Amino acid sequence: MKAGSIADRAPAARTGSSKNGGHKTPAPRAEAIIDPATPVSNGVTGTVERPAMTAHYIRSRIGKICVAITGPTPADMMRNAEQIIRENHFVEFRLDYLPNPLAIIPKIKTFLYERGEVTAIATCRRAATGGKFRGAIAAELEVLEKAALAGCHMIDVELQTAEHMKPAQMQRLRSRGAALIVSYHDFEATRDLDKIFERIRPFQPEFMKIVSTAKNLTDNITMMRFLERCRDEAELIGITMGEQGTISRVLGLRAGSVFTFASAHAGEETGPGQIEARTLREAWRIDQIDLSTKVYGVVGNPVKHSLSPLMQNIAFRRETVNAVFLPLQTTKLHDLLTLVKEIPLHGLAVTMPFKTEIIKHLEKTDALSQKIGACNTVVRAQDGKLYGFNTDVAAVVRPLERRLQLKGTKILVLGAGGAARAAVFGLVEKGAEVFIWNRTPDAAKKLARQAKAKTIRKEQLAKSTFDVIVNTTPVGMRGVKPASILEPKEINARLVFDLVYNPIDTPLIRMAREKGLPVITGVEMFVHQGARQFEIWTGKPAPEEEMLRVVVHALRQQSAEKTDKS
């Protein structure tokens, strides 16, 4: 393996003679002399045969994203296909999602005949290998054979199926003209990828698809190094699934994956962690990612519902910055630090629970981060060293300063984590009298001592009044339980500020409004601190109004979708 980070290892041209990683390259298939889509009658057997479509021919037709098409009935699946091809001409028909896959074959034949610009994969994955098809191998092969004859350009055969096929079955399937993808899916972990490669090699498919599950962030590194090692020896599609596998879905292309898979819409994923095609193309600009693209991310647990990737990617696009921003969910900081070095990452937005822990791994932090002991922004300098900043303090203090005089105000801060430290130190600095309540009293007492604040017990809240209540905990965040950190009787203040931004109307915000209290939602703080992060990373003024617009739009859209489902 070549030295250096993944981004440093430029792709090499496929020569057909590479021996990287100990793999030998099979002889390349001869290019079809006639149009690969033209059927040929076998005068001896009377069967219809077509020359197999070559990888070169397929690559000349496709883009970087293959959109998976699903549907409970043939009519639904074809209706979805009609919608998808308006923006995406490379699709996968997931035939295993249908109770009777053979019923859709005539419709696919007509569809592809009338739309020559569309390139299609046919997949009928059996339940035993992670799909939904309940039939036997022979039934699966019948579906794929007829899909190939109907005009599908590629057929996906799971490795376990290929290993059970007789030579005559494979020869018959290959004679139907479609390029062969032999695929392997590991829904549990990322194991020996080279071993899987060697199992697939004897079948000499036009494409190899190897998919694993990321149990941590560094599993993405394992997959991308594998792609780099073997990209000169085969046409590879490599992906890690799961919430922690997003990196491979976005950056795997520059490591050597021929294309990646995407869902047509949110909620229609055919694999764990699959991303909506429009998000990949418009927000993350996957078609423009190259070896010079800088990589940033939001790290924490959880970050599944974070809108930081949307907000920052839109800002990068608006200011023509060649960069991409990814969600990096992890429970272990050393997992992240390995990723920072290997990709390499150029900057981080740090969220719970790492705002304090990350400081000891940085070369230097700004005075504010040192003072409060929490850092939410990391930038990688040209020398590779990591430097930390805090943009949370200003993002908490400024919205409050716009509404009231902080000096002498009585403020209740809920929580004692990194965001709480920013709020408490920032508010004390402005002359406020700050009280801290946390479910773990010792953490509250420690923060109070350090910041010259006070603590308060839970039973005192209902009898106490404050000028402001500030929630710095994740309670109320989408996907986090319990729903509210306070009961209505404990909300006794002139103003309520919830740092949780997703959803906009958290349970705490709703209860405050029901009591007639003015509120500050977390969106204001979220966008403000994100804008400052953008400026630290890029040295350019942040398009703050545009960032606010896309965040509010996304949150309202999520709220509307949730209402429609309820």
What is each of the regions a protein language model found here?
Residues 430-451:
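NAD(P)-binding Rossmann-fold cofactor-contacting core
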Residues 59-84, 88-175, 181-190:
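Active-site beta->alpha loop and helix N-cap motifs at the rims of alpha/beta catalytic domains
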Residues 296-303, 400, 404, 409-428, ...:
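Glycine-rich adenosine-cofactor-binding loop
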Residues 499-566:
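Adenosine-phosphate binding glycine-rich loop
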